Regions:
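Glycine/threonine-rich beta-strand-loop-alpha-helix active-site module
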Residues: 38-53
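Catalytic core of soluble alpha/beta enzymes
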Residues: 125-314
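Mobile "lid/hinge" segments at catalytic clefts and subdomain interfaces of large enzymes
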Residues: 49-112
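Stable alpha-helical structural segments in soluble proteins, enriched in small hydrophobic residues
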Residues: 19-35, 138
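Short, small-residue-biased leader/transition segments that mark boundaries at the very start
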Residues: 1-2
Length: 315
């Protein structure tokens, strides 16, 4: 696809259009994979293949739901299981408990954009308490069996240098303190987009403070862009990257971003988008590129479940 990119001649592929270029890139990569290998997930070699740990959306907020919760996603990671089948089955038990608890409180059990519930809870603390209680009621242990990840999507509540979060206006340092308190109290694995993508000094601060404890994931910060990732690595902004094919526009560049991240001890998280199809290519690519994590919604909606089904077939 490099020749096609060179013909386009623009940094953001605006001449031919990123969607058109990505469609061609995907079609070529699939054809090449099936012509030379038995499957797409074998296209980058057969040694040290892993099944990524799923980050399953259980509660939606922010722009993905019609409620008062400012954080966009609350996810659970089934880390203490011997197989993907066992991990997903255990996750289903936790989700069932969440639904039961919401119904007992007469709260909405409709689903958000990515398959998680979208109840109108009072705060992020209410959501985290609900998730932890549901894990324990299912017979599992916090930290041993499940951890929690957040997508703060902080750019959505950032304005004029302040984070307008749950009725309060916070400076960068104050917002970092909010995250520190969360990490002290709950089994947090990662926080995505904890700060605004242009709050560069803030990213350095939060990485210094929380980086040794959790994964700080750059989505808006990096947008799967190799140059932005290089800057983040050099400046010590975040320690993980969200990988989205249609942000960068070609499979080749996506693989290069993952390679750069891996070489610099950044975790790569293969990700869906909020608007999805039933195509399961990202499941294959996550395995092929040895991504340790995959983020593709909840165990609901066919466009999300299709990715998990493909991972199950691979496993």
């Amino acid at each position: 696809m490099y020749k096609r990119q060179d013909l386009d001649g623009t940094e953001n592929k605006s001449k031919f259009g990123a969607n058109a270029i990505l469609s061609l890139s995907l079609a070529y990569y699939k054809a090449w994979s099936y012509s030379n290998f038995e499957a797409i997930f074998l296209s980058q070699g057969t040694e040290n293949l892993i099944i990524p740990v799923p980050m399953l959306n259980v509660i939606n907020g922010g722009q993905h739901a019609d409620n008062e919760v400012d954080f966009q996603e609350f996810m659970i990671l089934p880390i203490g299981f011997n197989s993907l089948t066992e991990a997903l089955s255990s996750t289903h038990s936790v989700i069932t408990n969440i639904k039961k608890e919401l119904k007992s409180r007469s709260l909405n059990t409709n689903l958000g954009d990515e398959g998680g519930f979208a109840p109108n809870l009072k705060s992020h603390l209410d959501v985290l308490d609900l998730i932890c209680d549901s894990i324990l009621k299912a017979g599992y242990k916090l930290n041993d069996h499940f951890k929690i990840s957040l997508d703060a999507a902080s750019s959505e509540f950032y304005s004029n240098g302040k984070y307008n979060f749950e009725g309060n206006s916070y400076s960068t340092d104050e917002m970092i303190s909010v995250y520190e308190n969360i990490c002290d109290k709950y089994p947090i694995f990662s926080i995505e987009d904890a700060l605004n993508e242009e709050d560069y000094e803030g990213w350095v601060k939060i990485t210094s403070k929380l980086g040794p404890k959790i994964r700080l994931v750059g989505d808006d910060l990096f947008v799967t862009n190799i140059q932005k990732l290089k800057t983040g690595i050099d400046e010590k902004q975040a320690n993980s990257i969200l990988i989205k094919l249609n942000q960068i526009g070609t499979v080749t560049e996506t693989l290069e971003a993952i390679k750069l991240a891996t070489e610099n001890n950044f975790a790569s998280i293969m990700s869906h988008r909020s608007g999805e199809t039933e195509d399961s290519f990202i499941s294959d690519l996550a395995v092929a590129s040895r991504c340790p994590l995959i983020k593709t919604g909840s165990l609901a909606r066919s466009d999300r479940v299709a990715k998990y089904n493909q991972l199950l077939r691979i496993s």
